[in-house]
Amino acid sequence: MSDYVELLKRGGNEAIKINPPTGADFHITSRGSDWLFTVFCVNLLFGVILVPLMFRKPVKDRFVYYTAIAPNLFMSIAYFTMASNLGWIPVRAKYNHVQTSTQKEHPGYRQIFYARYVGWFLAFPWPIIQMSLLGGTPLWQIAFNVGMTEIFTVCWLIAACVHSTYKWGYYTIGIGAAIVVCISLMTTTFNLVKARGKDVSNVFITFMSVIMFLWLIAYPTCFGITDGGNVLQPDSATIFYGIIDLLILSILPVLFMPLANYLGIERLGLIFDEEPAEHVGPVAEKKMPSPASFKSSDSDSSIKEKLKLKKKHKKDKKKAKKAKKAKKAKKAQEEEEDVATDSE
């Protein structure tokens, strides 16, 4: 019995023991690591389910699946890294709200997970791309939205790693970039969405309401009391961040798939035809083209034009011949009438 108990003890989460948080006064414990592993499992589960479902669809219908699989897999990697107590640096806190009895300096050093921000950099653009696709937003506008989203993640990464109050400058720039993306989606994209029907507009408004609440209210609040303001312990911070990340970067992208299918993939313009390759295998030896091949390379439209011109030319020729014959017959008739008149 004692051996069984020892085995169970050894089978627990030992990430903190194997990868100790050396140099950090405020860091996650085994409880925080357990929660991070839970979020990792949810993200990975969605990815594992969606990949086989994607392969059941034709290649041209898979783009919607890509937009849901990508953020889940990216965040699963980020959360596995954080749960393993890796991908972090100790940063001296600016504010002395959280304290421990073992810290040597005040404020102490807080554990900052840069792995989270790397995950955001890779995953955050996908919900924005999904919203852009609902309205058929032009490609360059989508690229602009994605670029501003990346500015948000980079600014917050720098803000989390900076000790001085200059961190709030990067924090503000990041929020500004997020606001610009939301304005772009609620103006340019929403005008395009309205043209596609009320049902598409309702889906867009619902999704954007959730995204804007989480992005412009929940995330700034969370950062302000965790990595920025050092108010919450890292364990509490992982729970706060984990819930928001699951909602915006995991659940929303997955929900987009059935809704897109309900609205109609073709209607949303999310079907991409791919022509099969003409040549497979070794490249054949090139030969000089013959004159006949140049003739056969004419486009269908030019051939049709030539045929039409030929037919028209033939018709005109026939009409001219008929007119000539009629003229000759008329002339002969007039001559006969003149001869008859002279004989009388």
Curated annotation (Swiss-Prot):
Other information: Present with 1950 molecules/cell in log phase SD medium.
For side Cytoplasmic, which residue ranges?
56-62, 141, 194-202, 260-344
Q: Where is the composition biased (Basic and acidic residues)?
A: 297-306
Sites of Phosphothreonine modification: 341
Give the primary localization class: membrane
Against Pfam families, the record matches this protein to: Bac_rhodopsin
- Please give the organism: Saccharomyces cerevisiae (strain ATCC 204508 / S288c)
Cross-link Glycyl lysine isopeptide (Lys-Gly) (interchain with G-Cter in ubiquitin), residue numbers? 286
Acidic residues bias locations: 334-344
What is the official name of this protein in its record?
A: Protein YRO2
